[in-house]
Amino acid sequence: MPISTKSSFYLPAVDISPYLQDPNSDAARKVIDDVRAACTSTGFFQLLGHGISPALQQSVFAAAAKFFALPSDVKSRCRNVGFRGYDPMASQSYELGVLPDLKEGFIAGKDIPLDDPRVASQRFFMGQNAWPPSELLPEANFRRPIEEYYQAMLKLCWVVLDLVAATLPYGPHVFDEFKENDPACPLRLLHYPPAPAPDVAKGRQLGSSAHTDFGAITLLLQDDHSGLEVQDCETGEWIGVPPNKDAYVVNLGDMMSRITRGHYKSSIHRVINQNLTDRYSVVFFFDGNLDYRLRPLDRVGQNWDEEDTLTVEEHMLERTTTTYNLKVK
């Protein structure tokens, strides 16, 4: 299907500053209504008024560029158990019939002590970050800005979860259990080299092949290069999402769709870097409490067969391991 920037696809820009100033005001209710409309139509919206400083954002982009410029053997040593550290180029694919994704990544999160039983049992995303040697990439140029940005994004994520909770009829504490127990919240730096034009034309090479996000909520910061496309489920068109330096692209993932019985959407999207230069993005994922069971929110507190309901960890392991094992056919 062709790529379009004009479509009925609903991708609003929502300024949340009125909600932050007074969540009970008329202006805040308009914000809540706009977010609800986005959640029920496409699951995508652009977030403005978030309070994350441009200087902090740029420091993370600069850190990413420095890391990905390191020699391959150095990057490859920055790997750890629990989906932390370096993700090599072309190591992942979400689709059959295409080449492996033309991207590399670096994943960080909250450091969990090595003597924690969850680390010893190698539970999903439980472990230590895998930083590059400080003599090759000083902490001031990489680790510190990443850690500062991570804390800022964690706070913003709680705001977004509270805002989504306000769009639902289950009260302000509906996600409290979801957020407990050191929730898995991966921060992923991504580098997309320019894609070879012939392979792009054949539909064989993408930076990130078509997929829905696995978790509950995604907060995406794009650089000034285009590449993100979302599929209109009604027409099949791919809709380009132009970069906006002031906005985060927020989208709901499969978990949120699941617990709302599909009322809130998790849309298919992809990345193709057809620019002549490298593209970078920084993505914060809220995957949640590993032991949380993904039951419908309208059944919370009622009788429900818990044994037949996947936990967050079971869901994430199933989806994540699959994407690293797909082969081109």
From Swiss-Prot:
Pathway linked to the protein: Mycotoxin biosynthesis
User: What pairs make up the disulfide bonds?
Assistant: none
The UniProt record lists the EC number as: 1.14.-.-
Record-annotated residues binding Fe cation? 211, 213, 269
Binding, 2-oxoglutarate: 279
Q: Example GO biological process term?
A: small molecule biosynthetic process
The protein's matches in Pfam families, at most eight in alphabetical order, are given as: 2OG-FeII_Oxy, DIOX_N
Domain Fe2OG dioxygenase per the UniProt entry, residue ranges: 183-288
| Textual note on the cofactor | Binds 1 Fe(2+) ion per subunit.
- What up-regulates or down-regulates this gene? Expression is stimulated under green light conditions.
- Effect of disrupting the coding gene: Leads to complete absence of citrinin production and the accumulation of a keto-aldehyde intermediate at the same retention time which is distinguishable by its UV and mass spectra.
| Keywords recorded for this protein, A-Z | Dioxygenase, Iron, Metal-binding, Oxidoreductase
Q: Which cofactor does it need?
A: Fe(2+)
> Does Metal-binding appear among the keywords?
yes
Q: Name one GO molecular function term.
A: metal ion binding
Q: Which InterPro entries match?
A: DIOX_N, IPNS-like_FE2OG_OXY, IPNS-like_sf, Iron_ascorbate_oxido_reductase, Oxoglu/Fe-dep_dioxygenase_dom
Q: Does the keyword Oxidoreductase apply?
A: yes
Q: What does this protein do?
A: Non-reducing polyketide synthase; part of the gene cluster that mediates the biosynthesis of the mycotoxin citrinin, a hepato-nephrotoxic compound to humans due to inhibition of respiration complex III. The pathway begins with the synthesis of a keto-aldehyde intermediate by the citrinin PKS (pksCT also named citS) from successive condensations of 4 malonyl-CoA units, presumably with a simple acetyl-CoA starter unit. Release of the keto-aldehyde intermediate is consistent with the presence of the C-terminal reductive release domain.
Instruction: Family membership, please give it.
Output: Belongs to the iron/ascorbate-dependent oxidoreductase family.
Protein name from the UniProt record: 2-oxoglutarate-dependent dioxygenase citB
The record lists the organism as: Monascus ruber (Mold)
What gene makes this protein?
citB
